[in-house]
């Protein structure tokens, strides 16, 4: 899975850059509204809301914006009705994409995504043709600097309920989605605090290099720039050095 861990690190850096714009707030507000609508406004009993509130804190979202978003989700305030939609797509090089969107107009979103895909060498896929490649998992990202003994950490994580551990920086601990909070808390008690989220992990990957690799990353960047798109997952495998070089070029 070379490239995927580096990708997690780059996406974290991208999120920090996005935070300088208002775009990340737009996405977080939608996520808070939907999480509160589905599981209630109390983060203690709503793991999904708890996870997105953590992201909101990291992005320095104003407290009143967070509270208004929760109230819109619970119905205490009138708000937009967002629908969760998953789009499946193909990128250059045979890479599969799993696109998570929150939209108040699915026809508009489908049209916009179709345009972005076709402009960047991709295409929408039939429902079900890509979904089987990805597994829904909980993921905890921990800075490698916090881990002095990887073997010891691995044993601790497995005892806590980890299913898989991906080395790199950050170290990524994969767990069953329903175990995410418990495993995160167990690791934190032992000094390994990290960021948690729900992710979609590919069962297999496709090696891409050169122009195909650049096209894949450019396409994902364009998709995630769309306000309706929350996150894009791909089963690409790009060497770390090449991935870093391409992202530096795209960011420049």
From Swiss-Prot:
It comes from Fervidobacterium nodosum (strain ATCC 35602 / DSM 5306 / Rt17-B1). This is Probable transcriptional regulatory protein Fnod_1106. GO terms for cellular component: cytosol. Coiled coil: none annotated. Keywords: Cytoplasm, DNA-binding, Transcription, Transcription regulation. The keyword Transmembrane does not apply. It is found in: Cytoplasm. InterPro entries: Integrase-like_N (IPR017856), TACO1_YebC-like_2nd/3rd_dom (IPR048300), TACO1_YebC_N (IPR049083), Transcrip_reg_TACO1-like (IPR002876), Transcrip_reg_TACO1-like_dom3 (IPR026564), YebC-like (IPR029072). Belongs to the TACO1 family. GO terms for biological process: regulation of DNA-templated transcription. One of its GO terms (molecular function) is DNA binding. Its main location: cytoplasm.
